[in-house]
Amino acid sequence: MAYIAKSFYDLSAIGLDGEKIDFNTFRGRAVLIENVASLUGTTTRDYNQLNELQCRFPRRLVVLGFPCNQFGHQENCQNEEILNSLKYVRPGGGYQPTFSLTQKCDVNGQNEHPVFAYLKDKLPYPYDDPFSLMTDPKLIIWSPVRRSDVSWNFEKFLIGPEGEPFRRYSRSFQTINIEPDIKRLLKVAI
């Protein structure tokens, strides 16, 4: 089992640029973490909505995308290919993320990233779909399998400005619909 951090601010990740992303720098801001894939059926929608949320809250929200290839092999690019895939293939049309992307990682199983070990420990299932499971067990390519596992691409975790995991959302919950919860956490008029 992966080490589970004591605090959200003890965590870090490595960006696509190879630089360390220290979560301690996120104090006082809400953070939206989403496992992403560039070849999923909802890639265009979700990536565009992530950009939109980051643009709506440029100083008070941090959006982090964690590319993952564990669901249908839908992020099969190498780290150095991901941005070009997004720009020219899907979403395409010159798309550029306005948020940070990390290097590819596992979100489930023995090699799960410590960020996801922590978040799944604190938020073991999506609030909008507490019975959410992988729809096709033949697609499970990791071990061990746990009830709290992320079930597909574009599952989301919202963390409050004090570092407390607030809510987990299923893959079917549209990213843009998280905005009222972001406003609530930031105490912005809805």
UniProtKB/Swiss-Prot annotation:
- Name the GO terms of the biological process aspect: biological process involved in interaction with symbiont; negative regulation of inflammatory response to antigenic stimulus; response to oxidative stress; response to symbiotic bacterium; temperature homeostasis
Q: Which UniProt keywords apply?
A: Cytoplasm, Oxidoreductase, Peroxidase, Selenocysteine
Show the active-site residues: 40
Under the heading InterPro entries, the entry gives: Glutathione_peroxidase (IPR000889), GPX_AS (IPR029759), GPX_CS (IPR029760), Thioredoxin-like_sf (IPR036249)
- Top-rank lineage group of the source organism: Eukaryota
Its principal location? cytoplasm
Q: Which Pfam families match?
A: GSHPx (PF00255)
Gene Ontology MF annotations:
glutathione peroxidase activity; phospholipid-hydroperoxide glutathione peroxidase activity
Catalytic activity of the protein: 2 glutathione + H2O2 = glutathione disulfide + 2 H2O; a hydroperoxy polyunsaturated fatty acid + 2 glutathione = a hydroxy polyunsaturated fatty acid + glutathione disulfide + H2O; tert-butyl hydroperoxide + 2 glutathione = tert-butanol + glutathione disulfide + H2O; cumene hydroperoxide + 2 glutathione = 2-phenylpropan-2-ol + glutathione disulfide + H2O
Q: Where in the cell does this protein reside?
A: Cytoplasm, Cytosol
EC assignment: the record states 1.11.1.9, 1.11.1.12
Which GO CC terms are listed, alphabetically?
A: cytosol
Family recorded in the similarity comment: Belongs to the glutathione peroxidase family.
Q: What's the subunit arrangement here?
A: Homotetramer.
Main role?
Catalyzes the reduction of hydroperoxides in a glutathione-dependent manner thus regulating cellular redox homeostasis. Can reduce small soluble hydroperoxides such as H2O2, cumene hydroperoxide and tert-butyl hydroperoxide, as well as several fatty acid-derived hydroperoxides. Cannot reduce phosphatidycholine hydroperoxide.
**Protein name, as recorded:** Glutathione peroxidase 2
